[in-house]
C-alpha cells in the first residue's frame, strides 16, 4: 500500500508545537543531536545564567531564540554542540527579594534572624521559578541541558571561583584598599563600576543645588575693599558641604574678583569665580549699573570686575569653615590645585569633601588636606554619613570626640537626617529634603549666592533603583587596570555583532577601565577566601576545599579550633563527586566560623566580605566543569574553551561580557569567547520599556499558546536585527503566521493533495537537469542560490537576513511564481515526465526550505520535514534537527536564467502596479506593453520570458523601443540630501544641468549608472543613485520606472478586450462556486447563465473556453435562471446555475 502525504483540515501552529514537542521527548531528539555527533568537531557555546527568583519574560524568548538558532545550525552543519544550562543564584537580587518577603532589612540579619536561616531562605527562594523557566524553555524550543545545569551556589562551583581568585592573588592582582567607591545604602553594599554602568543606572534627576559663599580669611588687598570677600563654589549635593575641607581651582583657568551684592540678603560682597563663567552668574546688563545705586530687591544686581588671577595665584588662600558642625583638625580650609577642574558648569571652583568623592579624596591627599571624619563608640574613624545614608546621631559617637570636636548646638538639629529622601522609609520625594534644609539655613546666614533646581545625571543602584553615594570603603579589588592593554588587544580579535558594540560601548569601557571592586558587604554569595591576622601582618588566600581542610587541621593542632568540621561531616578531600561536596557548605556563616593559623602562630579570621556576583557568572566557563579539579584536559586542550559563540542582551556588555573577558584575560591570557551577539531590548509597540506596572508587558506563555513558538520566534528574528531594539507588536506575529507560515503550509498542502492523487512517493531517480523544463531549472537554481546565501548568513551570525531570504523565496519565488505558474502541470491527467519533474522540483524546494528554516522555526520545520520524508524515506533521521544542512550545488545554478526570470518578475510587478493604479483587474486583457530597452542584454532577457510576462499581466503584445526618445519622455530629479553635501556651492549649477538633460543623456545615465557634466570647464559626476528618473505619462498609457527598467502600459480597453475580460471573470467566479460547493477537482459540471446584454456576446464568443477552464460539459444562456448564484459586476449582475453531472 502506497504511503500518503499528511493532509490537514486546519492550520494550527500551537498544536504543531505540542505535537512536535511530544515527538522530541519520546525520541530524545535533543540528546541524539549531541550523541550522534560524537567524534565530530565541537562548536562551543556558553549559556549566560539567568536568576530563577523571577518569572521569565518575552525578552527571554528573544535572547534564547538567538542562542538556539546558531546551536541548531551548527549541529546541522556536522558539529557537536553541547549546551549546559545554568542558574545565577547569588547576589543582591536574591537577597533583596528575601528581605522583602520576610519583611526585614539588612540590619535585622544576625539579630532577629540568623545568617544561617537567612541564607537558607535565599537558597530556597533563588530557585522559586525554576519550573516556569524550564516550561518556557521547553515550549519555545530552546535546546539546552536543563537536567544537569551549573548552579553558582554549588560548592564545587565556588571552589573553582576560589581557585581563580588565588591565581589573581598570586599574580599580585588582588589587593585591599580604603578608597571612595560607589555605595548603595539601600542595598548596604559597595558596587563595582560595571554594575554602576548597567543600562538605566544613570538617570536625570532634579535636585536642589547651591552656589555657596566661602568666606576668605586672608583675602588679597583688592578683594577686601568692598563688602565681605568670598570664594564661590557650586554643588549638586549640598548635604556634602558640612564635610568640606578644601576648595580646588584649575591650574590653567582664569579667575576674576567681582564686587557685587548678595541677591538674597542685599549685603555687599566681593566674590571670586572663573572668568569664563562670569555671565552664568551675573547678568551682563547689570555691568553698566553703579554699585552705589543698588537697592535690596532690585532685579538687576550690579557688578564690577576688579581683578584677574590664574588658578595658582589663589592656591594657599584660607577660608572659614562653611558649616562648622565638626572640627576636622589642622590643615583644612584652604585653596588647592586640581587638574580635573573645568569651566563647563559651576563656578570653576570645586568644593572638596574628601570622604564623598574619589577625585576629592585624591587631590586632598596630594595637598595634605585632612578629611572630615567622626569617631564612633568603637573608636573607629567614619565619614559624617553612616552606611544607611544618614548623618550619625550623637549617641553613636565617642563622647570625648564630641566634647573636643563637635558643635552640639549646630549639629543636633541635623543629626540622624538622611541625606536623600529615598533612604528614609518615612519620607517621600515630596517631603523637604536635607539639601533644601541646608540651603535654606545657608540663605539665612548669607552663605548662599544662588539656590536653584538643576537637572543632572546621577547614578542609581542597579537593583534597588535608589541613588548611590560615593563613600569611603575598606574593599578588596582586582587590579584589572594592570591588564587593560591586553584586554583591549584581545577584544580586537572577537567577532562582535554588531561590530560597533565591540569597538564602541565595550571598547570604550575597556579604555576607561577602573580596578574591579570585588567586595560585597552581604550574606548570600561566594565568600572571599582570604584569612587575615588581626594586626594584618599575615594573610592566606585559599584556592581549594582540600587546602582549607589541611589548614583547618593545622588550626586544630594549634588549638584555635576544637575539630575539623569538614572531617566531622565525613568530607574526603580529593573526591569530587556531588555526594561528597554536599556534606559541606562553603557559604556564610559556616565559613566564618573557621579560624586558621598564621606562620608565626597567630589566629586568622576570614575577611567578612563576599565577592561580586558578576565574578560568579564571569567564571562559568571554568566553574561549570569544576576546573581545574576536574576536566582539566578538556579545557586546556581547547575542547570546551573558549566559546565559539555567546549571546545575551545589550545590558550584559558591561556585565557578563566584561567579566568573562576580564577573568579570561587576567588568568588565562585568552579570550573567553570568539563571537558574541549583543541583542537589543524588547520594547512595547510604542517604543516604551515593558513593565507590569505600566501594563504593557507581554506574557510569553499565553503568546506561545495562542500563536505557537515558531511565528513568535520568526517575527522576533526577522522584524529587525537582533542587536536593534524590537518594538514588539502581537499583530506582527499574526502577520508572520499568515504570510509566511500560511503560505508555506498552503504550498505544502497543494503539493500533498496532488501528490496523493498521483501516488507520487519520489521513488523514481532524479530527473537530470537538462531534461527538466526551464521553469524547474530556474526554481532549483534560485533554491541553490538561497542555500548558499542562507548558509553564509547563519555562519556570519546574521539570522535576520537568513530569515528574510527564506521568507522572500517562499512567498515571491516558490508560491507566488513557481506554484502559481505550474498549477496545470499538477492538474493534468497521466503521470508524464513533465509532471514527475514538477513533483520532484517542488518536493526538493519544500524539503530544502524545511532544513533552511529549522534553526529559526524548529517546530513547523520538523513537521514539514517529517511529513515529506515520512513518505519518501529520503533521509533516515527522525527529525530535521538531526539532518544535514543543505549543500550548495553550483552545477544547478544558472545565473543567466535567474536574471531572465527576475526580469519577468520585475516587469510583471510594475505592470500589475499600473493596473491597480487605474483599477483594471488582471483578468481584463489589455493590448500592449511598451519597453524602451537600455541595452541588448536587457532586451535579450525580456525576449526570453516575453510569453511568460504577457501571460502573467494579461496583455496581447510587448513592443520594444530602441531608446526612449520620441516615444517616452523621461525626466531627472535631484536628491538634494545626497547631492548637496557632494557639490556644495556647485549644487545650483548641477541642479540646472540635471533639469536640462537630454533623453540621450538620461539613457546614458541609466545604462552606465553615472553621467559627467561640464560645468564651465569643471567636471561634475552624478550617479543614478543620486537622482530619481521618472517618465511622463502619454495619452492612453501609464508609465513606471524602476532602476534601469521602464515600462509603459496601454490602458485603453476595446470592446474585443472587454468581451475576453468578461469570459475570464466568469471562469474565476464559476471556479469559486465549484470550490465552495465542495466539488472534487475532477468533477464535470453543467452551466446555465442568465441572459444579459452586457455579457451575452462574450459568453457566445468564449463558450468553449469557459467550459474547458471549469470542466463544463455545456454552457447555456437562459432568460431566467432558478436557484442560481448571483454574480455581481461593477454595473450589472446576472445569475448562474452550476450542476454536477
UniProtKB/Swiss-Prot annotation:
GO terms for molecular function: aminoacyl-tRNA deacylase activity; ATP binding; isoleucine-tRNA ligase activity; tRNA binding; zinc ion binding. It catalyses: tRNA(Ile) + L-isoleucine + ATP = L-isoleucyl-tRNA(Ile) + AMP + diphosphate. One of its GO terms (cellular component) is cytoplasm. A motif ('HIGH' region) lies at residues 50-60. Its EC number is 6.1.1.5. Coiled coil: none annotated. Keywords: Aminoacyl-tRNA synthetase, ATP-binding, Cytoplasm, Ligase, Metal-binding, Nucleotide-binding, Protein biosynthesis, Zinc. Its main location: cytoplasm. Its cofactor is Zn(2+). It is an enzyme of class 6 (ligase). ATP binds at residue 692. It comes from the Bacteria. Gene3D superfamilies: 3.30.720.200, HUPs (3.40.50.620), Isoleucyl-tRNA Synthetase, Domain 1 (1.10.730.10). One of its GO terms (biological process) is isoleucyl-tRNA aminoacylation. SUPFAM superfamilies: Anticodon-binding domain of a subclass of class I aminoacyl-tRNA synthetases (SSF47323), Nucleotidylyl transferase (SSF52374), ValRS/IleRS/LeuRS editing domain (SSF50677). It holds the Pfam family DUF5915. A motif ('KMSKS' region) lies at residues 689-693. It is found in: Cytoplasm. Monomer. Belongs to the class-I aminoacyl-tRNA synthetase family. IleS type 2 subfamily. Catalyzes the attachment of isoleucine to tRNA(Ile). As IleRS can inadvertently accommodate and process structurally similar amino acids such as valine, to avoid such errors it has two additional distinct tRNA(Ile)-dependent editing activities. One activity is designated as 'pretransfer' editing and involves the hydrolysis of activated Val-AMP. The other activity is designated 'posttransfer' editing and involves deacylation of mischarged Val-tRNA(Ile). IleRS has two distinct active sites: one for aminoacylation and one for editing. The misactivated valine is translocated from the active site to the editing site, which sterically excludes the correctly activated isoleucine. The single editing site contains two valyl binding pockets, one specific for each substrate (Val-AMP or Val-tRNA(Ile)). This is Isoleucine--tRNA ligase. It comes from Bacteroides fragilis (strain YCH46).
Amino acid at each position: 500500500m502506497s504511503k500518503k502525504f499528511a493532509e490537514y483540515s486546519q492550520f494550527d501552529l500551537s498544536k504543531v508545537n505540542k505535537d512536535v514537542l511530544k515527538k522530541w521527548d519520546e525520541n530524545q531528539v535533543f540528546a541524539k543531536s549531541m550523541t550522534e555527533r560524537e567524534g565530530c568537531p565541537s562548536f562551543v557555546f556558553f549559556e549566560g545564567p539567568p536568576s530563577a527568583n523571577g518569572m521569565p519574560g518575552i525578552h527571554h524568548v528573544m535572547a534564547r531564540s538567538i542562542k538556539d538558532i546558531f546551536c541548531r545550525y551548527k549541529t546541522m552543519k556536522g558539529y557537536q554542540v553541547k549546551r549546559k544550562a545554568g542558574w545565577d543564584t547569588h547576589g543582591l537580587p536574591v537577597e533583596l527579594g528575601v528581605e522583602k518577603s520576610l519583611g526585614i532589612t539588612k540590619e535585622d540579619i544576625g539579630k532577629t534572624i540568623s545568617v544561617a536561616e537567612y541564607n537558607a531562605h535565599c537558597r530556597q527562594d533563588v530557585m522559586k521559578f525554576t519550573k516556569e523557566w524550564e516550561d518556557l524553555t521547553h515550549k519555545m524550543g530552546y535546546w539546552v541541558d536543563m537536567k544537569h545545569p551549573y548552579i553558582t551556589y554549588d560548592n564545587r562551583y565556588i571552589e573553582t571561583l576560589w581557585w581563580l581568585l588565588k591565581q589573581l592573588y598570586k599574580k599580585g592582582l588582588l589587593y585591599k584598599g580604603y578608597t571612595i567607591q560607589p555605595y548603595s545604602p539601600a542595598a548596604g553594599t559597595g558596587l563595582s563600576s560595571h554594575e554602576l554602568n548597567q543600562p538605566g543606572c544613570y538617570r536625570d534627576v532634579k535636585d536642589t543645588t547651591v552656589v555657596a559663599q566661602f568666606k576668605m580669611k586672608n583675602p588679597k588687598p583688592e578683594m577686601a575693599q568692598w563688602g565681605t570677600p568670598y570664594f564661590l563654589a557650586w554643588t549638586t549635593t549640598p548635604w556634602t558641604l558640612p564635610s568640606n575641607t578644601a576648595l580646588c581651582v584649575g591650574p590653567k583657568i582664569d579667575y576674576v574678583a567681582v564686587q557685587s551684592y548678595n541677591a538674597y540678603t542685599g549685603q555687599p560682597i566681593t566674590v571670586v569665580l572663573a572668568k569664563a563663567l562670569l555671565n552664568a552668574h551675573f547678568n551682563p546688563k547689570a555691568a553698566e549699573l553703579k554699585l552705589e545705586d543698588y537697592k535690596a530687591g532690585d532685579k538687576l544686581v550690579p557688578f564690577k570686575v576688579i581683578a584677574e588671577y590664574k588658578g595658582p595665584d589663589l592656591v594657599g588662600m584660607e577660608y572659614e569653615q562653611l558649616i562648622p558642625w565638626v572640627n576636622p583638625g589642622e590643615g583644612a580650609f584652604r585653596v588647592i590645585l586640581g587638574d580635573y577642574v573645568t569651566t563647563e558648569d559651576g563656578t570653576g571652583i570645586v568644593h572638596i569633601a574628601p570622604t564623598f568623592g574619589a577625585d576629592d579624596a585624591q587631590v586632598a591627599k596630594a595637598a595634605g588636606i585632612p578629611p572630615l571624619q567622626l569617631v564612633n563608640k568603637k573608636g573607629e574613624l567614619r565619614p559624617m554619613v553612616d552606611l544607611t545614608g544618614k548623618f550619625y546621631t550623637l549617641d553613636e559617637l565617642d563622647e570625648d570626640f564630641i566634647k573636643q570636636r563637635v558643635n552640639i548646638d549646630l549639629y543636633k538639629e541635623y543629626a540622624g537626617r538622611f541625606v536623600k529622601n529615598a533612604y528614609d522609609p518615612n519620607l517621600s520625594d515630596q517631603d523637604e529634603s536635607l539639601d533644601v534644609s541646608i540651603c535654606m539655613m545657608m540663605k539665612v546666614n548669607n552663605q548662599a549666592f544662588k539656590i536653584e533646581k538643576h537637572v543632572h545625571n546621577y547614578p542609581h543602584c542597579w537593583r534597588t533603583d535608589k541613588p548611590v553615594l560615593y563613600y569611603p570603603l575598606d574593599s578588596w579589588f582586582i587590579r584589572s587596570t594592570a591588564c587593560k592593554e591586553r584586554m583591549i588587544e584581545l577584544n580586537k580579535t572577537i567577532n562582535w555583532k554588531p561590530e560597533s558594540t565591540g569597538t564602541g560601548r565595550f571598547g570604550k569601557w575597556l579604555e576607561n577601565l577602573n580596578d574591579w571592586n570585588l567586595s560585597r558587604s552581604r550574606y548570600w554569595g561566594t565568600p572571599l577566601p582570604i584569612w587575615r591576622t588581626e594586626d594584618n601582618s599575615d594573610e592566606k588566600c585559599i584556592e581549594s576545599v582540600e587546602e582549607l581542610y589541611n589548614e583547618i587541621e593545622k588550626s586544630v593542632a594549634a588549638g584555635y579550633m576544637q575539630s575539623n568540621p569538614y572531617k566531622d561531616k565525613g568530607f574526603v578531600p580529593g573526591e569530587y563527586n556531588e555526594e561528597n561536596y554536599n556534606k559541606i557548605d562553603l557559604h556564610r556563616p559556616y565559613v566564618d566560623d573557621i579560624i586558621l593559623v598564621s606562620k608565626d602562630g597567630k589566629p586568622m579570621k576570614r575577611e567578612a566580605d563576599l565577592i561580586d556576583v558578576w565574578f560568579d557568572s564571569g567564571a562559568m566557563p571554568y566553574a561549570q566543569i569544576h576546573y581545574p579539579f576536574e576536566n582539566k584536559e578538556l579545557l586546556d586542550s581547547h575542547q570546551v574553551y573558549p566559546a565559539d559563540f555567546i549571546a545575551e542582551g545589550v545590558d550584559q556588555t558591561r556585565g557578563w561580557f566584561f567579566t568573562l573577558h576580564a577573568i579570561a584575560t587576567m588568568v588565562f591570557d585568552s579570550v573567553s569567547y570568539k563571537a558574541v551577539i549583543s541583542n537589543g531590548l524588547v520594547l512595547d509597540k510604542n517604543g516604551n520599556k515593558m513593565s507590569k506596572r505600566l501594563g504593557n508587558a507581554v506574557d510569553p506563555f499565553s503568546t506561545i499558546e495562542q500563536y505557537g513558538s515558531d511565528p513568535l520566534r520568526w517575527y522576533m528574528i526577522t522584524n529587525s536585527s537582533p542587536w536593534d531594539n524590537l518594538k514588539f507588536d502581537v499583530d506582527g506575529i499574526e502577520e508572520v503566521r499568515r504570510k509566511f507560515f500560511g503560505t508555506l503550509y498552503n504550498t505544502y498542502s497543494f503539493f500533498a493533495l496532488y501528490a496523493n492523487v498521483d501516488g507520487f512517493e519520489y521513488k523514481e531517480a532524479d530527473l537530470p537537469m537538462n531534461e527538466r523544463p526551464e521553469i524547474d531549472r530556474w526554481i532549483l537554481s534560485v533554491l541553490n542560490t538561497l542555500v548558499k546565501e542562507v548558509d553564509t548568513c547563519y555562519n556570519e551570525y546574521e539570522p535576520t537576513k537568513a530569515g528574510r531570504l527564506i521568507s522572500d523565496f517562499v512567498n515571491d519565488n516558490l508560491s507566488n511564481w513557481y506554484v502559481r505558474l505550474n498549477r496545470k502541470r499538477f492538474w493534468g491527467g497521466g503521470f508524464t515526465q513533465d509532471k514527475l519533474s514538477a513533483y520532484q522540483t517542488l518536493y526538493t524546494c519544500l524539503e530544502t526550505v524545511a532544513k533552511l528554516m529549522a534553526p529559526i522555526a524548529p517546530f513547523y520545520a520538523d513537521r514539514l520535514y517529517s511529513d515529506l520524508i515520512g513518505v519518501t524515506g529520503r533521509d533516515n533521521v527522525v527529525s530535521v534537527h538531526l539532518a544535514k544542512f543543505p549543500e550548495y550545488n553550483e552545477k544547478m545554478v544558472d545565473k543567466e536564467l535567474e536574471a531572465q526570470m527576475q526580469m519577468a518578475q520585475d516587469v510583471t510587478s510594475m505592470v500589475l502596479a499600473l493596473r491597480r493604479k487605474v483599477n483594471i483587474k488582471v483578468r481584463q486583457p489589455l493590448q500592449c506593453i511598451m519597453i524602451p530597452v537600455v541595452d541588448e542584454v536587457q532586451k535579450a532577457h525580456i525576449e526570453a520570458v516575453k510569453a511568460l510576462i504577457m501571460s502573467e499581466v494579461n496583455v496581447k503584445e510587448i513592443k520594444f523601443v530602441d531608446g526612449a526618445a520620441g516615444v517616452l519622455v523621461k525626466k531627472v530629479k535631484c536628491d538634494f540630501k545626497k547631492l548637496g553635501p557632494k557639490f556644495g556651492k556647485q549644487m545650483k549649477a548641477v541642479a540646472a544641468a540635471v533639469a536640462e538633460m537630454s533623453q540621450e543623456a538620461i539613457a546614458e545615465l541609466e545604462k552606465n549608472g553615472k553621467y559627467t557634466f561640464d560645468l564651465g570647464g569643471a567636471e561634475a559626476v552624478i550617479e543614478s543613485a543620486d537622482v530619481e528618473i521618472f517618465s511622463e505619462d502619454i495619452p492612453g498609457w501609464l508609465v513606471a520606472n524602476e532602476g534601469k527598467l521602464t515600462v509603459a502600459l496601454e490602458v485603453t480597453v476595446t470592446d474585443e478586450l472587454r468581451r475576453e475580460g468578461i469570459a475570464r471573470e466568469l471562469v474565476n467566479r464559476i471556479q469559486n462556486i465549484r470550490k465552495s460547493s465542495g466539488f472534487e477537482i475532477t468533477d464535470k459540471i453543467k452551466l446555465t447563465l442568465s441572459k444579459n446584454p452586457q455579457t451575452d456576446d462574450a459568453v457566445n464568443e468564449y463558450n468553449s473556453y469557459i467550459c474547458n477552464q471549469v470542466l463544463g460539459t455545456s454552457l447555456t444562456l437562459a432568460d431566467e435562471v432558478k436557484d442560481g448564484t448571483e454574480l455581481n459586476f461593477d454595473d450589472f449582475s446576472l445569475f448562474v446555475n452550476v450542476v454536477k453531472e
